[in-house]
Amino acid sequence: VSAQADYDARLKKIQARMGEQGIDALIASRLSTVGYVFGAFVPWRGVAVIPREGEPQLFVLGLDSERVKDDSFFKNVTGVAPLPGMAMWEQILSYLRVRGLEKGRIGVELGHSPIRIETFLLASEYEILKDAFPQAKFENATHFLNEIFIIKDEAEIESFRQAAEICDLGLGVVLKELRVGMTETEVAGIAEHAMRKAGSELNWTFTGGQEIGSGHRASYYWGGCTPPTRKRIERGDNVILDLHAMYNLYLGDLARNAIMGEPTPAQRELSDIFVAACNLLLESLKPGATYGEVADKMDAFMDRTGYRQYALPGYGHGIGILGNEYYPVVMNSSVPYESKGDLVLQPNMVEVAALVLNKPGVAGMRMEMTVLITKDGNEPLNKVPFEPAIIER
């Protein structure tokens, strides 16, 4: 039984921080923020306006506004369309004017992402706001919202568990059916069918849904993205199986590996180092450790084994509600909106532990899994082993 999400409590967390920052209203444009507050799947450009007190208002395409309203916890949903009086920003400005906020302090979501368009406020939208309200003060709310989102509540953690369980199930079905001669897209379809049957709402990633890479496509240098193709899987290939599920808008991300037939000595050596590195990474994700410390420990291990050049220099990323919450990446660097090496792991954070170890001409292996940070260590939400499966079919 899933824990019931407390959307009132979520709203109050945001409004409390708005009060501390002196923000009168927050314009939330990120898909993840809209989902966190309203609880509905909003595939379109949706913008929520959150007042410092009272319920939020969501503006979304009119062709989907009734469905979104039905699925949302808060029912204040307004349909928009490119028609006089119905345009999104025309209606948002009207909402703010009615509340006397022409000279107010307005929060917006500014920033960028290294991996995808995170639906931050667009430059053109920012210009509309500044031109309409030249005396208003606009504050970037992205940082304090990220601080709220990074600590998960009970309902979020339960949804992560369900998404992880669905990914584990999908992997199990794939490993039972995987055989030489299948195409990568066929394998992706097997995974997708199994996970949809188990309740997954979306193969959420923009990297090809269920990522399947085989042979040379599994071992691109630093290659961490394998959208499936019509390539046929051959004997001797290693195969990356990177599966994605969604449950109550919360995401599952599981990557494991298979080898078609008896591994070569070089494949076995890489596999042994890969498995040892996976275990070290999992052991390193514990409260009190910084992202930079975890990355340094992994880099040192890769140096000792002589495989540093083949390891993607990032050992995990955030995960959350639809929109991904990818920030921050587990690296010992600090680039605004991308990485934060001094960030400390805390209980109730959920991190994707990730390892990409690719040696072109030999094999490439990938591990991803959701990990809950606990007060004493961590809990892997995916339960499947790190060792590559040997497939003799």
Protein language model regions, located:
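Active-site neighborhoods and metal-handling regions in enzymes and metal-associated proteins
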Residues: 1-393
